[in-house]
Each structure stands twice: as structure tokens, then as C-alpha cells.
Amino acid sequence: NTVVGRRTINGRRRPRRQTRRAQRSQPVVVVQTSRATQRRPRRRRRGNNRTRGTVPTRGAGSSETFVFSKDNLAGSSSGRITFGPSLSDCPAFSNGILKAYHEYKISMVILEFVSEASSQNSGSIAYELDPHCKLNSLSSTINKFGITKPGKAAFTASYINGKEWHDVAEDQFRILYKGNGSSSIAGSFRITIKCQFHNPK
């Protein structure tokens, strides 16, 4: 009986040792595959850090948008708006950020007329674009705003001498205007400019 008992005990222990050895060999394969999968995201993170490193190089310049108004325009008003260091209607531009850089360019200007005249009034306000600041008074009345209705005109860089950089000491362009109505208030101009600044001081 004891001999049979030993055989049955030994018979059971032998397959257990074999299964344990088989189980010990399996985790080795799993560990190798997990190491390979962990290395791939590390390479991607290094690539992301390189792209972020290029961001500070863009700090050499700045892009800004300014909105200002020219109020209390009479139906017979006339004048000019010079864009550059002479733009006194927008001190945040002329006396602010413009003094922090060596060069600038205005890439777009939007001229809007906000009517304040009654429907019984008549007349219009003509405007003209001077891309080289050579005109002192209006020379053409083709483009105009009726004083009883709102109007809008937009000019891109090619129309306002805005493709090249300008020294901050020189003006870029002008808008001249002249009305043919009465002396009563006709409305106001709402002006939006998109600017770029280069080479900080």
C-alpha cells in the first residue's frame, strides 16, 4: 500500500513541476513585448518637445488689431487720416506699441461710416485712399457714403502700401474725406486696422 501511495504522489507532483516551468517561461515573452510598446510613445514625446521649442522664435514680432473712431463728423466735414506715427486718433497704436518696435506694416484697414443723420437730411461724404501720403486734399469723389445710411469699405495690403515693412518714424498711407452736406452732425467713422510689428527695440 505504501508503494502505491508513493507512486500516486510522485505521479501528481511531476506534472505540477512541468506546468510551473511552463508558466515561468511565459512571462518572459510578455515582458519583452511590453518594453517594445513603451518605447514608442517616448519617441513621440520627444518629437512634441521639439515642435514646442520653435514657438519662442516667433516672439520677434507681433500682430495686433486696433479699432478706433472719428466722431462728430458734420455733413460738410473734410480732412485726412494718416496711418502711422501721425495717427493721433489711436494713441494705443501711435504712442503705444509702435514705439516698442523698429518696423511695422498695416495689412488691412476697414473704414465704416456710422450714420447719425435723420432721414430728411441729404448729402454724402466722399473718401479717397492715398497709399503714399502725397495728397493733401481730396482729388476724387467717386467713392462716397450717403449720410443717411451706413457704409463700409475695406482695403487690403496691396492697396495701402502694406506689403513691405516701414520704419516706425514714417507714415504708411492716408484716407482723405470731404462732405457736401450741411453743418449738422452726420455721423462718425469706425476704423479697424490689422498691423504687424517687427524687430523689437
Swiss-Prot record:
Its main location: virion. Residues 9-23, 37-49 have a biased composition (Basic residues). Pfam families: Luteo_coat. InterPro entries: Luteo_coat. It is found in: Virion. Residues 1-63 are annotated as: Disordered. Keywords: Capsid protein, Virion. The keyword Membrane does not apply. GO terms for cellular component: viral capsid. It comes from the Viruses. Residues 50-59 have a biased composition (Low complexity). GO terms for molecular function: structural molecule activity. The N-terminus like those of many plant virus capsid proteins is highly basic. These regions may be involved in protein-RNA interaction. Major capsid protein that self-assembles to form an icosahedral capsid with a T=3 symmetry, about 23 nm in diameter, and consisting of 180 capsid proteins monomers. Most of the 180 monomers are the major capsid protein, but a small percentage contain the minor capsid protein, which has a long C-terminal extension. Belongs to the luteoviruses capsid protein family. This is Major capsid protein. The lineage of its organism: Viruses, Riboviria, Orthornavirae, Pisuviricota, Pisoniviricetes.
